[in-house]
């Protein structure tokens, strides 16, 4: 299987399925990533340990601090005590909360995480359009603005001076 095909299947699996943790599995929150595909996590009871990322997720799915995971315990592990079995996105968290499988200790953290995502995504005001009127090509208000670039504003006075010279 090619790398692109593998990535497609892994992303489809992570985004599509809504799973429920089994008796052995735990829902944990990522605290930090020390490296080597290891992540330090915290359980709902406050226990901290390292989890490993399986090879199918490596370079396909990215995990950041504050994300939630479902992990399978590893019996023989001293430092690394579990392996990631599923990465939870916002939709998965909401469905687990509705079904009653979400730990109470993570309820406040999940709400803050969802609210923070809502605040960082700017909402564009909807422009009412008349039925016979098309949007003009001169109106650029709906275009994406790259905030990482400086905005240069040229005044009319400067442009007139350049034309005269």
Curated annotation (Swiss-Prot):
MF terms in GO: RNA binding; translation initiation factor activity
Which SMART domains does the UniProt entry name for this protein? eIF1a
Q: Which residues carry this modification: Phosphothreonine?
A: 33
Q: Which UniProt keywords apply?
A: Nucleus, Phosphoprotein, RNA-binding
Q: GO cellular component terms?
A: cytosol; intracellular membrane-bounded organelle; nucleoplasm; nucleus
Q: Which family does it belong to?
A: Belongs to the EIF1AD family.
Question: What protein is this chain from?
Answer: Probable RNA-binding protein EIF1AD
Q: What is the native source organism of this protein?
A: Homo sapiens
């Amino acid at each position: 299987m090619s790398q692109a095909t593998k990535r497609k299947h892994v992303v489809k699996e992570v985004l599509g399925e809504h799973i429920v943790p089994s008796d052995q599995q735990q829902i944990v929150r990522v605290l930090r990533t020390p490296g080597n595909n290891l992540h330090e996590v915290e359980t709902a009871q406050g226990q901290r340990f390292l989890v490993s990322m399986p090879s199918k997720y490596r370079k396909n799915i990215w995990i950041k601090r504050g994300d939630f995971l479902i992990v399978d315990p590893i019996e023989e592990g001293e430092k690394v005590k579990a392996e990631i079995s599923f990465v939870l996105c916002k939709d998965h968290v909401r469905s687990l909360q509705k079904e009653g499988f979400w730990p109470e200790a993570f309820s406040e953290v999940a709400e803050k995480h969802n609210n923070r995502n809502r605040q960082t995504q700017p909402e564009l005001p909807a422009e009412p359009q008349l039925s016979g009127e098309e949007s003009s090509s001169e109106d650029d208000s709906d275009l994406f603005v790259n905030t990482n670039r400086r905005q240069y504003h040229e005044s009319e006075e400067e442009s007139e001076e350049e034309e005269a010279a």
